[in-house]
Regions:
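ABC ATPase nucleotide-binding domains
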Residues: 72-78, 82, 86-227
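Non-catalytic connector elements of ABC transporters
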Residues: 237, 249-353
């Protein structure tokens, strides 16, 4: 099911807009993550999609149908919350089958459907157990199966991995991706964890301060951020940011003068600072002093002093710790310039111009 927002605004108190003029389309059959800091509008957006909230203004469409005034029951979406909300007195089988029981589906039919879903989420060997006897990952699988019981056109997941340990989070994000692909259901996944979003999503919507900062594929977010917020929010380690003026002399032959005059902040990915000449991929060269270096396994990093600014490079393999000063090169990929408003004015696709 395709989901479309047209000029959607949401205000809880009638004074301050939690969401302002949201316009987007989520294609049918895709997995989209809503990513951003706390208070950015992720859960509010999800609740508007589900029908738990009604927008202050604007329209919401499922396919070509206007569902703006339809409640959650009428929209027929499946939801999985952070706490799973399973029924502890019921077996796994009856938890999965519960929505079908409420819909007056016969026992044999609902149990057959529940068993099929249990196989899909890999809990078919746990059907007779109470949910309290399950691990966190198993409980989440049951919650997803229950959400799929009525064959929803949309599956909504609100921070579903936050209660799991690091190993289980990795395992379960891959399972969610597998389940989504096998069912083909349009899935919307809310998270504040960029690693989850980058690994699981077809597309990511970055939300902050109630507005969409960028809505694109994970790779595009990283390679072509719309603005400084996205550049800093996406990527690990966090992108190096320094005043553009500190680089102006070394960029004079690589960046048009008109752009340099507008540039306020330079963003440089740590892998875009290299200690060797990469030929045509090089944008600029500078001389820097290594103030600290670290090597662990295949990872070699260095803190570099450049005109009084600190830069981190993660491409220092093969560089001797006895070389405190040397020439560094900035690659075209991973370098960006932003203006006073934070908008991207150079970098990403602009290198091809």
């Amino acid at each position: 099911m395709k989901v479309t927002f047209k000029d959607v605004t949401m205000s809880y108190d009638g004074k301050k807009d939690t969401l302002k003029d949201l316009n987007f389309t989520i294609p049918d059959g895709t997995l989209v993550s809503l990513l951003g800091p706390s208070g950015g509008g992720k859960t509010t957006t999800l609740n508007l999609i589900s029908g738990l909230l009604a927008p202050t203004a604007g329209q919401i469409f499922f396919g070509d149908t206007d569902v703006t005034k339809k409640d959650a029951l009428a929209r027929k979406v499946g939801m999985v919350f952070q706490n799973y909300s399973l029924y502890p007195h019921l077996s796994v089988l009856d938890n999965i089958a519960f929505p079908l029981k409420m819909a007056k589906v016969g026992k044999a039919e609902r149990h057959a459907k529940a068993k099929d879903l249990a196989k899909l989420v890999h809990v078919e060997d746990q059907l007779d157990k109470k949910t309290g006897a399950l691990s966190g990952g198993q409980q989440q699988r049951v919650a997803i199966a229950r959400a799929l019981a009525k064959s929803p056109s949309l599956l909504l997941l609100d921070e579903p991995l936050s209660n799991l340990d690091a190993r289980l989070r990795i395992e379960m994000r891959e399972e969610i991706r597998r389940i989504q692909r096998e069912t083909g259901v349009t899935t919307i996944f809310v998270t504040h964890d960029q690693d989850e979003a980058l690994h699981i999503s077809d597309n990511i919507m970055v939300l902050a301060n109630g507005s969409i900062q960028q809505f694109s594929s994970p790779q595009t977010l990283y390679d072509q951020p719309n603005n400084l917020f996205v550049a800093k929010f996406i990527g690990e380690p966090v992108i190096n940011t320094i005043p553009a003026q500190a680089l102006s002399a070394d960029l004079a032959n690589a960046v048009p003068e008109a752009i340099l005059k507008q540039a306020v902040t330079a963003g440089i990915r740590s892998e875009a600072i290299i200690p060797y000449d990469a030929g045509e991929n090089v944008l600029a060269k500078f001389h820097g002093k290594i103030t600290h270096s670290s090597k662990y396994g295949r990872e070699a990093t260095a803190d570099i002093d450049y005109n009084g600014e600190r830069l981190l490079s993660t491409e220092m393999a093969g560089v001797s710790s006895r070389q405190p000063e040397l020439d560094f090169y900035i690659t075209k990929s991973g370098f960006f310039l932003f203006d006073q408003s934070g908008a991207l004015i150079f970098g990403g696709e602009s290198h091809a111009e």
